[in-house]
Amino acid sequence: APGEHVYGLGDKTGGLDRRGQSFVDWNSDAYGFGASTDPIYKSIPFFIASGEGGGAYGVLLDNTWRSWFDFGHRAADRIEMGAEHGPIDYYVIAGPGVGDVTRRYADLTGHAPLPPRWALGYQQSRYSYMSEEEVRSIAARLRAERIPTDVIWLDIDYQDRNRPFTVNTQTFPHFAAMVHDLDTLGIKAVAIVDLHVADAPGQGYAPYDSGTAGDHFLRRADGSTYVGIVWPGRAVFPEFTDAGARRWWGTLFAPFVHDGVAGFWNDMNEPAIFDDPAKTMPADVRHRIASDDFAPRTATHAEIHNVYGMLNTRATYDGLRALAPDERAFVMTRASYAGGQRYAATWTGDNSATWDHLRLAVAQTLNLGLSGFAYTGTDVGGFAGGPPPDLMTRWFEYSAFLPVFRDHSAKGTPRAEPWLDGPEQLAIRRHYVEARYRLMPFLYGLAEANARTGDPLARPLIYDFPGTDVHDCDTTMSFTLGGRLLIAGAPRPEQRNSYDACLPTGTWYDYWTGAAVTPQPSVSGPFGTLTLTPRLDLLPVFVRAGTILPRAPLVQSTSQRPDGPLELDVYPGPDCRGEIYDDDGHSMGFARGMFLRQQVTCAADASGVARVTLAPREGHFAPWWNAIRLTIHGGVDYTARIGGKAVAERDGGFTFADQPQGAVIELDRR
């Protein structure tokens, strides 16, 4: 239709709206990809179309062969799609809204599991930290600089000759002790484990030996084992379409789980191959399909290619759950397919240190969220090249409000740790990391809601404000967290001239000051505009009126117990509500009722807030807080009572004992 806009397809480049473009699905290693490179790492053949009236529908083309989509590129009024081979098997998902489609798509393809809380913290990485000494030094510097951090990532150079499931004992002589010592600092270790097993007969390399004995490696049409060149040199590849091979793969993680490694990173799983002109396996490589969910048969790589990376993460995830059944598994993947969110978080791959890539990062993250992958991030600052200081700082600011926050850079590029551009840049970056940690109760609540509903954490404006994609306002760098926090950056993040920030119609509050803002009504759409002048130290963030936002005192790690009350910030407005959610952050106990959920509402009229109500608590988890601090924004002074007893006001807020049975806080204007 003329006013239709198209979203989804995972990590495709080209901006948020797919209208007028065409794409190919074929998982591809795309180092340093450009703003219009296609295909890249993932194949998620699902799109959502949204019309002028805010109505929406979705289509999933469940075909794993090389496929294509045309959204008005050849013919302006037509959507076309197809594939080289395979079934014409597609699902049409009704709305009426974008959110309805997204949730039903998650119901169809599977919900992402609730991640460990530490996966929402700040994460430091480099290709590569070359030694145990360097890892310890990075951890010590992060703590000395007071940069809240939850993860340090280990890229391939921790391994012996780039062989998966090994450790270079020359450079990492005390690997298990290092992992333990990081944990005492509140920092988890996440280690890369690629799927290419070194072709090393007779060398005592256990993954090769056990995989060969179990007949777990792919073969060519003539029956010979397929060998490709990747990081270890000659390598063989697991038969992830075989349930037995997946179980075997999962057992290989046991020593690392025993050593305390908290998560694993499946890279290069498009799969990427160095010595093939197509940069992947030949199409005639054979895959044995032997799994409870499919009839047994043999398929060619041309059919399996787009799901191979997802099956790799399935094997990893299932293996970790089997090794530690009461712990949540964390897997990061580069390649995947529709439904891969059941097994892994993802990132947008080997991006570049440019302002255009920062713009692209927001669109890719939002479209991945609409495609099921709620846990998505980008390499902060860009993987390829070196970011100028201002770009790195701005990237930190945006990433503080995106689901996965990882600073990662390539070998041979300038170092990109947050302190490297001097104290002024570091202070800004630290401030935004701290802001994220203060928001952790809110972020973690969004994560829990995603596991239940499929609602993404980071959302385009159309998700919660239908019709906002039909307007003249440039919202390229705008998105929301849970429909409650609106990040409204300049359309070109490097610009220094003023711009009109577009806020959906209604009342909003400045997150940084708590003050209500009054946008100018727009004649072109359901927006008001605020004219803002960019500042390097300020990313504009607004809170939707009617929000009750849970926050926490600052910590240096999510494993640290916050010192002080839970904070509830009330931003008066219609349908005023919020939710408090908590659990232990790492185990499966929440599935057995070991969680806490409490609804919070407020009643307001023209004169202000009359009361805040905490409903009786659900679940059986004792939280870290024993008190609550309530702050009412909007510039009105109040007195407060609970059960007729006055609550003292201090520094603009009211602190009272935790209320697991529920309570009503009565408020009167002074």
Model regions: which residues?
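Catalytic core of carbohydrate-active enzymes
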Residues: 317-331, 335-347, 360-364, 368-378, ...
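A residue-level signal for conserved active-site and pocket-lining positions in enzyme catalytic cores
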Residues: 46, 105, 142, 182, ...
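Catalytic and substrate-binding clefts that recognize carbohydrates or anionic sugar/phosphate headgroups
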Residues: 1-116, 126-127, 132, 139-144, ...
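Aromatic- and carboxylate-enriched substrate-binding clefts and catalytic-loop regions
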Residues: 148-429, 464-466, 475, 481, ...
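Glycine-rich, histidine-containing beta strand-loop boundary motifs that form or position
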Residues: 11, 48-50, 60-63, 71-72, ...
